Amino acid sequence: MISVSRFLSPQFYAIPRSFVKMSASATQTAGEVSMGIKPPSHPTYDLKAVIKLALAEDAGHTGDVTCMATIPFDMEVEAYFLAKEDGIVAGVALADMIFEHVDPSLKVEWMRKDGDYVHKGLKFGKVSGNAHKIVVAERVLLNFMQRMSGIATLTKLMADAASPACILETRKTAPGLRLVDKWAVLIGGGRNHRMGLFDMVMIKDNHISAAGGIVNAVKSVDEYLKQKNLEMDVEVETRTLEEVKEVLEYASGSETRLTRIMLDNMVVPLENGDVDVTMLKDAVELINGRFETEASGNVTLETVHKIGQSGVTFISSGALTHSVKALDISLKIDTELALEVGRRTKRA
């Protein structure tokens, strides 16, 4: 198992004291959402609707029957966020949005912000207010935070190892959570690839096959963009050095909108667990800075450093979002405080 602390930069351990100590000035109501690293833009994505859907699927048609049976309706409690393993926390701003939707009167206080390092056992935030509302929000916001923090943690590890290349995610995100997943990548220090099919032309193997070859595919895109008067980045996937040469030859004799060349599976895995990046380096030398380059395929936490030293501009990894391990985070009600409030209300 790979240790998170082995890869995280030292500055994540040197947390300023002002973040550790709880202070009244850091307290906010749930309606006062403070957003540090903003989510990426999307023309049709409604983050509030996603939150509403997540809460609705949990509540069903009756609401939280267990909560209604066990907790007095007017009971006030304080609960704290607990990191149960080391990592990068993400989803703080989203948690604020969820609390705001559930009950704007809840008081929320954070000792860490999105992108900060948390260690196992750290209480990094707290919320106080109506117990029913806090428990209703609990599972939904933890589902978001655990997934986002897992993505951010892996992204941080890979981004540090990949330098000077930039790490990118892909469109291999959880259905309905595209923006959330890509937001977590930004929080972890990565860069976003295209948001969807609409904001960048990306010529992949199926397009190339259907167009009758890589040159035909790139040429068709150039003609289409000119005809429609569209301005956007264009990337083409190459699988061999011969395809790289074909693209470069076409670009030398034509006016093209091409901006990036993907070098797919040019990282060759070896039996000893290492990788051979000879083909990747050869492709980068052929391109010689004329276009951005992106390495894809056989990218892991163990191989990304070697790939990053090859001279490529970007390294993309679907693993950042499609199979990431969630970071273990919990939300615990302060039992002693809850009992004291219960005694005062004569319901404990």
From Swiss-Prot:
Substrate binds at residues 139, 170-172, 194, 204, 237, 264, 296-298, 317-319. Keywords: Chloroplast, Glycosyltransferase, Plastid, Pyridine nucleotide biosynthesis, Transferase, Transit peptide. Pathway: Cofactor biosynthesis; NAD(+) biosynthesis; nicotinate D-ribonucleotide from quinolinate: step 1/1. Residues 1-41 form a transit peptide. It catalyses: nicotinate beta-D-ribonucleotide + CO2 + diphosphate = quinolinate + 5-phospho-alpha-D-ribose 1-diphosphate + 2 H(+). GO terms for biological process: NAD biosynthetic process. SUPFAM superfamilies: Nicotinate/Quinolinate PRTase C-terminal domain-like, Nicotinate/Quinolinate PRTase N-terminal domain-like. Coiled coil: none annotated. Disruption phenotype: Embryonic lethality when homozygous. Signal peptide: none annotated. GO terms for molecular function: nicotinate-nucleotide diphosphorylase (carboxylating) activity. It is found in: Plastid, Chloroplast. One of its GO terms (cellular component) is chloroplast. InterPro entries: Aldolase_TIM, NadC, NadC/ModD, Nicotinate_pribotase-like_C, Quinolinate_PRibosylTase_N_sf, Quinolinate_PRibosylTrfase_C, Quinolinate_PRibosylTrfase_N. Its EC number is 2.4.2.19. Accumulation of NAD by over-expression of the bacterial nadC gene in Arabidopsis stimulates plant resistance probably via salicylic acid (SA)-dependent signaling. Involved in the biosynthesis of NAD(+). Catalyzes the conversion of quinolate to nicotinate to nicotinate beta-D-ribonucleotide. Belongs to the NadC/ModD family. This is Nicotinate-nucleotide pyrophosphorylase [carboxylating], chloroplastic. It comes from Arabidopsis thaliana (Mouse-ear cress).
